[in-house]
Amino acid sequence: MSSNTMLQKTLLILISFSVVTWMIFIISQNFTKLWSALNLSISVHYWNNSAKSLFPKTSLIPLKPLTETELRIKEIIEKLDQQIPPRPFTHVNTTTSATHSTATILNPRDTYCRGDQLDILLEVRDHLGQRKQYGGDFLRARMSSPALTAGASGKVMDFNNGTYLVSFTLFWEGQVSLSLLLIHPSEGASALWRARNQGYDKIIFKGKFVNGTSHVFTECGLTLNSNAELCEYLDDRDQEAFYCMKPQHMPCEALTYMTTRNREVSYLTDKENSLFHRSKVGVEMMKDRKHIDVTNCNKREKIEETCQVGMKPPVPGGYTLQGKWITTFCNQVQLDTIKINGCLKGKLIYLLGDSTLRQWIYYFPKVVKTLKFFDLHETGIFKKHLLLDAERHTQIQWKKHSYPFVTFQLYSLIDHDYIPREIDRLSGDKNTAIVITFGQHFRPFPIDIFIRRAIGVQKAIERLFLRSPATKVIIKTENIREMHIETERFGDFHGYIHYLIMKDIFKDLNVGIIDAWDMTIAYGTDTIHPPDHVIGNQINMFLNYIC
């Protein structure tokens, strides 16, 4: 009897031990799955933040609420996504064809009066001659009179059904040529938008770390997908970030120089890439009546008020005639050397941006001979430039903007900062003027980088106006650039998106706008660095704002 009892106890212990062991095994397996799910959720969230989008639609773990800046970025991107929806295509023949599309002048006349509006109805078709049922084509309208060195942009209204209304204001008399270029079909524009926002790796940044007589280069970037130790260069307030692989035996503070090069990567398919061959970019759509005659008709021009900051230029905001830029929304004065000298007396002028503003600081001494460069003992073309006229107490300074700054040349990172931080350092007063431009160097990167910077600049200007409302701030939009370049990285479609974003973000600020996009279309320059006569007219517009 006692042996049976002992046997039963032994069996009970063995069964209990087996049950407990089985339960531990099951729990451990489920915990592993749960931990894997959590880890997957974290990695997906990080990837969405760093490589695709700041705003993942779903997440398996609670996320921190979006900041005000992140919400604004999200809102702007959602609006742009609606304007540039996916346009997949099975064959190039189903994309927009300049040859098969028709442009018809509405209510045509033998002659027109100066100041009239001329409208063109554009109906787009594909290469098979079929009517397109949606819009989104990237078009450029321009009128010109080469004999008069005259030009102006046209306004394009997209009805999103395959038809467009193209409007020209006839600003001058004479024979006028009309041009309507298909820069990219809607399918190409959609592909560029998708490809742009897919990755940060189209540009390779190489940082040079210097420690005494030794130096080493490491890879850097706006994001880095690496398990190696990183140097983090963060601006928490404006949510800006830049990273470098940490070199051995050197501190992160030893980062002194930077250079970039293009990475051989594309997010376009072969079929999409075929839309950007040289022969398919910037194709003329006006085939029949290209020339019209415009007479004066004794029309009087309205006398507008003088140009002031806070005015919002229409499109077009002016035109060029005999090489001079003439605004249509304010009475702009053509300043001679004497007036320029008087205007600049006692002024502190800060040019913050890229090389299209560096052109300004090279131009000033050609007109104002008393302005001389002051040697700051820096090297390279991207160093800080300083012009001084001690007698008239005039100072003009140019500084490049911070990352991303794309160039094969090695540039210094000493005294190198984001534009919002540069603005924060300026006390400002009625004799201080700031000119800001950025965008060309942002084109190869996802759009959230540009939007975040624009919002940071907007907030810095608002802070400046709180402490010094009399300071003049001027925003210069991007120039159009070469049509036949690396379209995926640097094409003007990306610049046009920047143009729309800048207008939206800065619309409520009391700033002056130099619409270089409109101006360079009117001049027909098609180069990132336009010639001196264009730079001179941009500067003349600036001086009208501050004098």
Swiss-Prot record:
Cellular component annotations (GO), alphabetically ordered: extracellular region
PANTHER family from the UniProt entry: NXPE FAMILY MEMBER, NXPE FAMILY MEMBER 1
InterPro entries per UniProt: Ig-like_fold, Ig_E-set, NXPE4_C, NXPH/NXPE
Glycosylated residues (UniProt): N39, N211
Signal peptide, first to last residue: 1-21
Keywords: Glycoprotein, Secreted, Signal
Record protein name field: NXPE family member 1
A Pfam family matched in the record: NXPE4_C
Family statement drawn from the similarity comment of this UniProt entry: Belongs to the NXPE family.
Location(s) in or outside the cell: Secreted
